[in-house]
Amino acid sequence: GGYGSDALRTIVKHGFEQLNLNRIWCEVYSNNDAIGVYRHIGFKDEGTQRQTVFKNGEYLDSHLLGMLRSDYDKLKEENKIWKT
């Protein structure tokens, strides 16, 4: 992975393993290429709000993505993306 996905994995790992969070979520606009990184490391699509912001002459959708502790634990157990 690149620097962005490595940094995101570090933050998510800290959230679940050090802060003992049950859920981590983010809101990403449809023009943000980083949405693929979130999905790649295991965030799931939880909903879309259509045309929530007007930017650079166009309306953009807002996507809600989330990861549960149980998702993280399963991905770690399967050694997918989350090498310890």
What is the predicted function of each stretch?
Residues G1-H14, G36-H40:
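Conserved acetyl-CoA-binding loop-helix of GNAT-fold acetyltransferases
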Residues W25-E27, K44-L60:
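Conserved catalytic-core motifs of GNAT/GCN5-like acyltransferases
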